[in-house]
Structure formats: C-alpha cells, structure tokens
Amino acid sequence: MIGPSLTAFPQPRTCEAARDAAGRCYILPVENLFHPLLQEWFERRFGRPTQAQALGWPAIALGRHTLISAPTGSGKTLAAFLICIDRLIKAALDGTLQDISQAVYVSPLKALSNDVHANLQVPLDEIRDLARNRSVEIPEIRIAVRTGDTPAHERQARARKPPHIWITTPESLYILLTSASGRRGLAGVRTLILDEIHAVAGGKRGSHLSISVERLCVLAGAPITRIGLSATQRPIEEVARFLVGTENLDPQGRPLCEIVNIGYGRAMDLAVEIPEGELGPIATNALWDETIARVAELASVHRTTLVFANTRRLVERVAHQLSRLMGEENVAPHHGSLSRQTRLRVERRLKQGELKVCVATASLELGIDIGAIDLVCQLGTPRSIGILLQRVGRSGHWLGGVTKGRLFPLTRDELIESAALLYAVRRGELDRLSIPAWPLDILSQQIVAICSAETWKTDDLYRLIRRAYPYRELPRESFDAVVHLLSTGIAGRLGYRSSFLHLDGVHDVVRGRRGARIAALTSGGAIPDNADYDVILEPDGTRVGTVFEDFAVESMTGDVFLLGNSAWRIRKIERGRVLVEDARGQAPNVPFWIGEAPARTSELSTCVSIVRQAIADRLHDRNGCIRWLCDNAGLPEPAAAAAWAYVSEGKRVLSAVPTDRRVIAERFFDESGGMQLILHAPFGSRINRAWGLALRKRFCRSFDFELQAAATEDGINLSLGPQHSFPLEDVFQFLRSHQVEETLAQAVLSSPLFSVRWRWTLTRALALLRFSGGRRIPPQIQRMRADDLLAAIFPAQAGCQDNRMSPDIDIPDHPLVFETLRDCLHEALDSDGLREVLRCLERGEIELLARDTAMPSVFSHQILNAMPYAFLDDAPLEERRARAVFMRRVLPEESSDLGKLSPDAIQSASEDAWPEVRDAEELHDALVGLVVF
C-alpha cells in the first residue's frame, strides 16, 4: 500500500510512485505518460502534481485498478481523469477517436456530477485553445451528464451520438445498462471512475452499483480499469474490495488494486460554539435566535459560509431566519426537494462567489468544488465522524487550504456529542465501513434488468452476481428462490403479478418476459420513493420543488409556506400537485418532510462514553476537568464548563454517570400517577431502538398492556402505568442474548417500522411498481397495493389479531419477507449490537445500577422531550405519558429535599384516606373500600 508517509512532491517533469504491495518500485517519467500539449497545459495551470496525482497516475497508466483515498482538495478527480483525457487527446490527434463512450464517471450526487462536468469541460477547452496556438486542431471530445435531472431531448440526442465520457449517477448507469441504446453506447468503455465510493458502499445503493459495474464489464467484453476515489476510510482495504469485485481478489482475499492512501493530512480549525444562554434538553426559541445571530456574525467576516442542517425543514427555517438578518440576496437553501433549476442556480452562485451563506442538507456534503467557501457551520451534530470530516472539508477546498468548521450544539447532550466528535477527530478515529450482505430486493431488480436485455443460463447469471463484492457469499438457494419468485410471480386475488421472467427448466436458461425491461427502467433504483407532491408555480407551470404528502393534504387554499427561501401561496391542491403563486412579504409556515433520523455511529458512541467517563473522573476538580476538555476535546472554556456542570448535576441524582460500560435504570413518578422508566445507555439509537422494541414486547406479554416507548442515542424510555410494579433491578433480566432476536423480530412485526420497510422492499424488488402506463403511481395507491401483497404473501401478519392462536406470528420462508425483516433488524436497528450488549450484561462486563428517584435526572430530560422520530409506538405527541413529567428546575444541593414531606401534609393525607365514620353503613363502606380481605 502507498502510504501518507511520502510527503515530498516530485518535480514537474517526473511522476514517481512508491513501492507497491509486493515491494516493487516503478518510476514513470511524466513525458511517457502525457501528450506534450496536455503536459504543457498542466504545468501552466498547476505547476506540479499533488501527492495523490503523483502516486496515482503511474498505476492508472499501467491499467491497474486504483483506489485513491485522500482528503478534499487533494486533486483526486484530476488524478483519475487525466490519463483518460490524455488517451482521448492522443486518439483524436491520431484520427482514431471513435464515436463511442470510452470512460464512465459515477458520482452519488447530481450536484457533484454537474460540478465535475463543468470542471472537465474547462480543461478540455483550454487544451484545445493551446493546441490552436500551436497550429494543431483537436477534434471535439464530448462530455455529457446523465442523471435523473437530464431532460428527455438531451437523453435522446446522447443515445444517437454517445459522448466519449459519461458523467452519471448509479441509478442512471443502471438505466444506460438496461436500455438498448445505452448498451450500444457503453460497449467501448475502458475506464470506470467511481467517485465518493465510500458514500454508497455501506448501503443498498452500493450493492446496486456493484452489480451494475459487473454488468458493464461483461458488456465491454474487455478489461476495464476501475478507479475509485474516496475520503479516508476504515478499513481502506474493504473499500478496495468493493471497487474491484471478487474476480480481482487474491487467494487470501486481498484486493488486486493499487491503494493510494494519503490520509487526512489537511490543517483543521475546528471548534464548538455555544450560546450565552444555558443549553437545555431542547432548543428554545431564544437559543435559536442567539445561534442564528452568531452564524450570521461569523458569516459576515468570511467570504462564503456553508451551513449544514440535518433536515430539510431545518434548512428552510435557518435560511429564512438568516435572510432576514443578512438580506435575501445573500442567503440560499439547497436540498433534494428543490427543483433542478433552483439547485443549479444555487450551485452556480456559490461557485461564482455571489452567495454569503448557503444552508444545505447532505445534498452539498460531497466533493462539489466551491473554492470560495472558507467556513462550514454544523447545526446540531452530524452523528458521524466521517460525515463531520466530509462536511467541514467543504471549506478551504483548494490546495493548502485550511479546513475551518464550527459546531453548534443545540442541547446539552449534543454538547457532549460535539466534544466526542472533536476528541475523535484529534485522535484520527474513523467510522468503520460495513457493507450489507447480498440484499435480495436489489438482486431481484438487477436480475430483471439483466434478463430483459439478453437470455442467460442460470449458472452463468449466478456467477455474474457473485462477482459483485456484496454478493460474494450469496447462497445458491437464495438466488434460486428469487429467480423462482420472478418467474412465477405472486399469487393474489386477481391472479399472479410481478412475473417478469421466463425460466426454462429444460435448458436451464432465464429470459425476460414482455414488460420486464419497461418495469426495470421506470421503477428501478435503490433509493426508496418519498410520498411527495410537486409544487408548481402558476401561471407559467415552473416546478419549484416538492413537499411531503401529509403537509400537502393538511394544507388549504390560501395557506402560505416556505420553499427555497421564498414564500408561496397555495391556489389549488390537486392529485400529486400543489399549485402556488408568489406570496413575497407574507409570513410563511415551514413545510415538513418525514424520514428516518440519522443514527449515531457506534464509533462515535464509544467516544461519547469516553468523554462522559473522563468528565466523571474529574468532577471533583472542576478546573482540571475544564482543562482536559479544552486540551483533548477542543472545547472553549465556557463550553467545557457547561459540560462539567451537566454531568455533575446528573451524577448528583444518579450517583454515577452512564457510559457504554455502565447502564443505569432510573424510575420516577409522573403527574398522572404512573411511572417513567429510563434506561441510560449511550449505545446509539440503532441499538437502543432495538432494545426498546424488545423490552416493550416483553412488557406487553408480561402485563398484557401496550406501553408507550421511545429511544434516543443515549437512552430508552418506557412509560409505565400504576399497575406495573416490579423490582427495578429486574428490568435487566427481561431479555436474554440467546432469545433477543426472536423477541425483536416479533416486536418489529407489530411496529410501524415493518410496514414502511415492507413497501421499500417491494419497490426495490419491482414487486410494487413506481410507474404504470407512463404515469407515476400515487403514494396512497402504492400503500394499498403493498397491503394487498402483504395479505397474499404473509397473511398471518395482515390478519386480525383476535384470530391468532399463538402470540407469536409464524414468519413465512419468503425472500421478500426475509429481506424486509433483515432490513429492520440489521439496517434500521442493530440486533447484532444489542445481542453483544446483552452478552456483556450477562458476563458482568457492564456495570448495572438501579435508581428510584424523586425527580428525573438531567440525563433523562432529552428523552422525555423526544420528538416523534424517537417513538417506538404510534401514540401521537399530545398523548405521550412522558409529557406528564414535571421537570422542575432546582439547585443540585436542594434536590435531596424533594422526597421530604411535612407532618401537616401527612396528617391531611391520612384524614382524606380514612373518612369520618358516622353510622354502621359508613363503617361498612369504609371497610369494603380500604381493607383487603
């Protein structure tokens, strides 16, 4: 592996690589790599190569698969492209340049695709101008973007005359590989570049892409050089395996790939900002105003500031507030629910330095080149070490630039998490990449796409799929089950549906039926559909963006809402569309979108526990604790003092601090007479949600009562009634590691999570189509059809509970049910992590404490105020028993007096409990009501 220890850059005329994995050293002069025109242009423009370029070019020139892992601003993109451009220029000058695509660049974001297209077109134009000055005419080298935003007329033009370089997304590459015209244009591809590969490898989108890559290699019929570009990852070898596939692994499983691992060597200026007012369990309006004012103050002394928020609703709110402080012309939002034209306009203004502030979700998280950004602000926490590095890396996006980021925690728990983030960054910690194992819904979709283009022998098809790294361990019986499902379809009340393949058992071949290709083209992809309504500006019909279905349905004609930092008045709501007009100057509502909140990574959760324990160990020495937080977690003194005070107040009530080595059960009364049980367990929401669902199921069966429950990154809340009495220590014995997955599976089946994931699985497997007859199927119809398919495949789940003979639901052996449950247990939740936690409890490796308290500790305040995304049941916000807890604010030294009662109060309560008896009947009633026989 080529490592970051090579810090000396080579001179402009040579490009030297270090020793490869086998210890061999090779040196290739630059003049042997590039055409003189390209070499001259590069030296004029850049002077000399960056380390990523110097170490990557020789391997790429030799046709080796290459993974370049380096921070933003290190020249990764040009390192990947320049050899390819050089070959195209040489072929153009030799007269051998053909009208076929020779390179494909894939990025996970549309914005990144548009940015790379612009950044490639400029060098090509400059090289052609340089050639003209040398009296040399270079034929046109065509570059084209193909994404979901590409207009139909452009797609048709590219089908007739393919570009030499395709710039696309995973979904559009899949469409090109499935359509007849796209396949013809891709047959000559010899270079494949996968940018920001780490951003997709850990999800089903990456599994989908991995099969598309293998399909491209088969279509090309010749070796394709695979080039991967990645941020710093752990383990980097796993990313390399994902890049090259199983056909390019040695017998020991090592990737046959040149790994250029530069590491994260950029200078960083990261800090935490807290308001002067006290942080609490939720962000108050006063705190918000102070935070937004501070962001505006920082933005005013920087060229361009990029502000990240975790939700689209928050993006719109922050952009609106900042525009009131800084002027509407200086602020713009950017997120996926804005129209293509709006997003492109914001990106162009950013690149040209016309915006002071852009507020974005993850839509601008990856490597779009915006050189003017010199500050990144993160509102709340990103829940991930890697995402923090990715986001703050948008600043100083030039060679030698300094990464500058400011974190704005909005609650006390986010303050501790922000400290843990900076602690992790200072120590070079990274989130561990985990690649999902052979997802069957993606497999189903890709098999339909593959077989709709040509006939395959089933054995050959199985071998092709297993070449994709996520499918390296795909069991043959699972593959056969999916093929059988696609060939027979799903039996329903109206006959069989979703039968896309014809399986010839005699000749062992499979081919697509009529309609298979259309279904694969119009309903493919790994990203689940959102139930969104288009927002259309009248009278010109311009698409402004989208809003969530529930928001559209709950709105009325005349309502004013915010989208894209502009106010719109609703004129009419139609099926799937909201017709609007400009409402500039009127006070708008902020729309909402519903989705799953990002979960904190296990590596960051570990760092949260380290920081908590470090504070707990130094509570006796306030100044020493503050110094430790300043030195090791990068907190300013006011933030460090606030962290010390928070942990100190919590320990005063619980006598200990919860960490990943110490779980505390806390129980207290609420105002309704019931009790709230809090499990303080900072394992992250994926483990805690699994734990909470399983506990809720056990409580339901033990007490015959459906509990309200919630789970956050740092704990679990169970709302108990007056009848739920048990020794508090018993809560740790309710679940055992050897049976928790079965209990959790039953809990998931009765939760809203299963129905959502079921619909996603059906859509990805093409059992539930997104389009039919050229029109999009409305979300409400999709939900109805998903329910019908559930009744056909899994009648026990869809049936009436009163007719069940057993409390457990028998789970059928069906690939779609299997995949949905696996999604719930291992993607949305972390059942493996929960099992390991329970094993540690059973082995005594985690300390267990039980505390009945007179008042809730400050550690419980955030979960008691949890928002709906944390709920584990379907009770609405206004009916939550946790909201009946009175969280009074007292000084810590006064908290010990909360359980004391005055003698007068005791006498008054006694008189109320034992009524005055005046005759025999009243004595009888008193004895019946108060005495237990």
Where are the regions a protein language model picked out?
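Loop/turn positions that initiate beta-strands
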Residues: G558-D559, L563-G564
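Short, solvent-exposed secondary-structure boundary/capping segments
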Residues: E574-P591
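Helicase motor core with emphasis on the C-terminal RecA-like subdomain
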Residues: V30, F34-E40, R48, L55, ...
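Short alpha-helix capping/helix-loop boundary micro-motifs
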Residues: R543-E554
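Short beta-strand-centered aromatic/proline hotspots
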Residues: S566-I573
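Extended, highly charged accessory segments
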Residues: Y462-D532, T546, P591-F592, E596-F933
